[in-house]
Amino acid sequence: FFYLARICNHCSYPACLAACPRNAIYKRPEDGIVLIDQERCRGYRKCMEACPYKKTYYRGTTRTSEKCIACYPRIEGKDQAGGGLPMQTRCMSSCIGHIRLQGLIELNKDGTWKEARNNPLYYLIHIARVALPLYPQFGTEPNGYYIPPRWVSRPYLEQMFGPGVDAAIEKYSAPDRELLAVLQLFGKDQRICHRYEIKEAPKVFETEVRGKKFVMHNDTIIGYAKDGTKII
């Protein structure tokens, strides 16, 4: 048993959108957030049936469906606390365990991610490959990623996160210099970190983890907002 926080994945190919007979669900092109138009929704609840993650809900008082809106005013930089900079959602920034990280990426015309080597999300998902999608077999291409826990049954984790589980846990159990630094960005600031850089320092510790060499350095990681402002 382990606790798994499940939120709307704002999928690249949302099943809720395809199922809505009223065309009330749409995906914003500027940031990929999936929203329900409350004026068009008539509460048929087809979105609830279609979503494999069960993240749309029916509100009896309004007789319409609702879902996570990804705190889009904060993403747009309209929260005064952010000084005009894009901010992480409330669920991300309020996590007392500092285990959540949100980011924004750009897409190529074919829908693939543009290379952004020093973007924290790009690194965790496409370089280190320790962050995996939940139930990728559903085919919706979810945009919520998880670093799988180490002490849970592997067959169970493979069912949840796909075939990359073993490699992710192996990498995460004894993180290399860059991965260890990037993991320090989690929960450090409410503003979205678009880019990081690492200032290297001398080695301070060395040991062996599960038969693999692990070295820790006294490095400093610096995070920058979209406009280049130093935020971490």
What are these model-derived regions, one by one?
Residues 42, 52-53, 73, 117-119, ...:
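General N-terminal targeting signals
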Residues 11, 71, 147-149:
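Structured loops at beta-to-helix junctions and adjacent beta-edge loops in soluble globular domains
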Residues 7-9, 39-43, 115-118:
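N-terminal start-of-chain detector that recognizes signal peptides
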Residues 80-81, 92-232:
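Long, compositionally biased charged/polar accessory segments in the mid-to-C-terminal portions
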Residues 13-40, 46-65, 70, 77-109, ...:
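Iron-sulfur cluster-binding cysteine motifs and their immediate structural context
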